[in-house]
Structures are given as C-alpha cells and as structure tokens.
Amino acid sequence: MKPRISVLTLGVADLEQSLAFYRDGLGLPTKGIVGREFEHGAVAFFELSGGMKLAIWAQDDLVHDTGLAKTPISPTSFTVGHNVARREEVDAVMAQARRAGAEIVKAPQDTFYGGYAGYFRDPNGHLWEVVWNPANIPADA
C-alpha cells in the first residue's frame, strides 16, 4: 500500500462547538461547515501542514455512515501530535488550548528523549500531544 493518508477525521458530539474550538480557539484555518445540504453530510475541514487536513464530523453521522455502534470516545486509543519548532511554543499552544476550553491532562514537562511535551483533551475528549522534539523539528518551521 502506498501511503496516501490525507485526512484525519474526529467524531464530535457538537459540530458547532467543535468548529469554534478549533477555528476560534486554536486558530486552525477552515472554510467552516460544508455539506449541510446532505443528510449526515455536514463536516468541517481544517488545513494542516503538508497538505494534510483535520476533519470534524458529528459522531452520530459517522455512526450512520459506517453502520458501527456508537461508543464513547477513548482518549487512550489515539492521540493527535502537534510538533512545534521551539520548546517555548509547547507552553504557548497548551495555554491557547486551555483558554479555548481544553482540559490539560499533563502539563508540559521534559521528556525521556530530550524533548518537552504536554497533553490536552479537546471538548470531545480527543487527546492531543503538543511536543517539541529537538531530533524532529518540523520541516516548515
């Protein structure tokens, strides 16, 4: 399989609340919610680096589309990593997330690999790691 992963979709309880968190709170660029004209089609896409997109889609619509049973979000089954270019950016992003309504799970601290990182949960419980790793500085930094 040639890797062509281009969109990561998070199931959310409230699409409007999640849009506000990511767009207004974290400042992620988006055109807002699209697809409202389709039953179960409303979704928002956020532009990330390298052409990657983050999507938020109502969990009930994701359940409808897949046919799977709805389950609670498990913050320990998947994390979204946000790598930053400088150590102090970890603190800044974590503070921004807290102001936007995130729950700080683990305050930023030194890591075993020589980096600096912290964790927060978005309003839906999705776990994010904000990390500075001196051995893995983002190319677009």
Segments from the language model and where they lie:
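Vicinal oxygen chelate
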Residues: 1, 4-14, 44-48, 67-141
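N-terminal beta-strand motif that seeds the catalytic metal site of vicinal oxygen chelate
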Residues: 1-19, 31, 37, 79-82, ...
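Core segments of cupin and vicinal oxygen chelate
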Residues: 9-63
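A short alpha-helix capping/helix-coil boundary motif
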Residues: 21-23, 71-74, 100
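Short hydrophobic-acidic sequence motifs that mark active-site Asp/Glu residues
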Residues: 53-55, 79, 127
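Short, charged, solvent-exposed linker or helix-capping segments at domain edges/interfaces
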Residues: 57, 66-68, 130, 140-141
